[in-house]
Amino acid sequence: MELKATKITGLADHLFRHEAGKMVSVLTKIFGTENLETAEDVVQQTFIDALQVWKLKGIPDNPSGWLFRVAKNKAIDVIRRNKHSVQYNFGDDERLLLKSEYTLAPAMENLWKEEVIQDDLLRMMFACCHPDISEENQITLILKTLCGFSTAEIAKAFLTSDDTVSKRLYRTKEFFRQKK
């Protein structure tokens, strides 16, 4: 049983490093970069669910596909809960599709296609490299959000403290919230 849990945790770590950035990119397209923390929360909850479900039911045949499906469903839940909220600034192309229950599922399906995800990763990278954000903060956000590095790993690479990296991330996310 412990070997199975170790295997699942190792797989989840690997998938987080390789898939979380893609999920955050799509989710920030849906929710807007000013709601980056909402996107990260959805991704984190998706991985928590994966660890819990996979320990009970085993690893699915396509773990990445499972993660994307759960993240997509969680995003739909957030949209439904906040349908009338002005907090989420849906993109122009998605705004009408995501606000209608009839078009919500097909619109979400299109947003999670591989070629769209690649465009979203690039879009998110450009957003992280906004000229009003310092170079250190740009790199820190990209490493954390798109590459899946931990705060400790980033701190070690920058020869700085975890606290400094956390502050950089906070300031950058605050910039996006204010940019709304």
Where are these regions (language model features)?
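Structural recognition of an alpha-helix C-terminal capping motif at a helix-to-coil junction
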Residues: 41-48, 61-73
